[in-house]
Amino acid sequence: MSKSRNTFIRASDFVKKFDPEFLRYYFASKLSNTIEDIDLNFEDFRKKINSDLIGKVINLLSRSVSFIKNNDYKLAINLSDENHYQNFVSRTENILKELHLRKYSSATKEIMKLADEANTFFNDNAPWKLDKDKDKKIIQEISTQAINYYKIIITCLLYTSDAADDV
């Protein structure tokens, strides 16, 4: 950032336009356990937030909740694929290790891999293709599993603490 090149922004101005949680995520995605400068490039910032947080994480929640809504917002007791879920959960251990070692960029990449996998799970199971009356239980289980994936992902995003508190 440079004041002379007009790429400077004050924190007070930034929070008027953007959620500070987005900036935390952006910086975390750039931070490693080495000392390096981080440039706040607004085009890169916009792309990363739109692609990662909105396109992957928020979209997963939005799509899965829309099916739960049709069931009076009740989650299923069982998941549609318990083995897939357990494998998903086990991968968070590596993310926690990366975070502990301050390898935030690496951890963020792994979290986004989980988000991709969660979205693939939801797309592959395609609850929108099932009969909403005949397959109601299956739709509820698929959607519940996707919501649980969302909770894991958002909890891993420690640096988006306000969002994690909402879960």
Spell out what each predicted region is.
Residues M1-E82:
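Catalytic adenosine-cofactor/nucleotide-binding cores of aminoacyl-tRNA synthetases and other
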Residues V57, I111, D162:
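Residue-level signal for inorganic ion chemistry
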Residues L61-I95, A115-K136:
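Conserved, charged catalytic cores of large soluble enzymes
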Residues T92-S105:
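Long, non-coiled-coil amphipathic alpha-helical linker/lever segments
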Residues E98-L101, K134-T144:
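Short, contiguous acidic/charged loop-to-helix segments that flank catalytic cores in large enzymes
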Residues Y104-E110, L114:
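C-terminal structural cap/anchor segments
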Residues L114, Q140-L158:
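An amphipathic alpha-helical micro-motif enriched in hydrophobic residues
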Residues Y159-D166:
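Conserved small/polar residues in nucleotide/adenosyl-binding loops
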